[in-house]
Amino acid sequence: ANARATLPQVDVSGVGCGCDASLYLVKMKDADRFGPNYCDIQGVGGSAPCAEIDLFEGNRQAIASTVHMTQGTGADGTCNQDGCTEKWGEHETNTRGELVSELYGPGGNIDTTLPFQVAATFYPDGTVTIDLSQTDYIKDKEVRVRFYDSERTGNRGGIDSPVSPEDRARTAAALGDGMVLVSSLWASEDLSWLD
């Protein structure tokens, strides 16, 4: 059976460019023990890198979701530290040529001046999909946008390609072993990878 996780309602209306509101899963060891057990794919704070699934990283103008299962960088087809990612906001259009400002942002299909839902579905083979949804009370309908799909986020340098079977297997194993949900809000002078 597929596992579906609906995350807390997201409100980024006050989160501008240069800021990153994040919800992500990490393969944290000994998560039930008190102490310095935090880890992520980048090895922050000197910790050993661990598997990470960025369910939502964003602000009112940009959004990214990324699966990171292995070390390494570059568009080499693996879900490495750069990751198997979908990003909207860095460019005017996404990889399918759709205008990002119409899909996500103030006044977009997902209007970031209002709260919205983020829902992730994890399939037994390690496929991940992430949907954004929002109720449009004026038009009395729910708007749903498929944001992330393992079928088109295979880290091939901006080309739609599927995540490899090996990385799907790693994702399934990490999820099967259990991961910890982490939230953060941070700012940087250089968030060009997102904004």
Please report, for each region that a protein language model flagged, where it lies by residue.
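GH16 jelly-roll
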Residues: 1-195
